[in-house]
UniProtKB/Swiss-Prot annotation:
Keywords: Ribonucleoprotein, Ribosomal protein. This is Large ribosomal subunit protein bL35. GO terms for biological process: translation. GO terms for cellular component: cytosolic large ribosomal subunit. PANTHER family: 54S RIBOSOMAL PROTEIN BL35M, LARGE RIBOSOMAL SUBUNIT PROTEIN BL35M. Belongs to the bacterial ribosomal protein bL35 family. SUPFAM superfamilies: L35p-like. The keyword Ribonucleoprotein applies.
Length: 67
């Protein structure tokens, strides 16, 4: 059976947590149009990583067969 291909776009966007049980992602809305957003919003609410929702996790794992 041939090797499964990893979806490169997904590999760049998602990382496994240390235990390998959850998938982490960057938060949205912090790329451009940032002038009207408060520093507090950008620092607290938009910074850091978030976990992929349980309903989406199966699809992400299919895109990352070796993760």
């Amino acid at each position: 059976m041939p090797k499964l291909k990893t979806r490169r776009a997904a590999a760049k966007r998602f990382k496994l947590t240390g235990s390998g049980k959850k998938i982490a992602r960057r938060k949205a809305f912090k790329n451009h149009l940032l002038n009207h957003k408060s520093a507090e919003q950008k620092r607290r609410r938009l910074s850091g990583m978030a976990l992929v929702d349980k309903s989406d996790e199966k699809n992400v794992r299919l895109m990352l067969p070796y993760a």
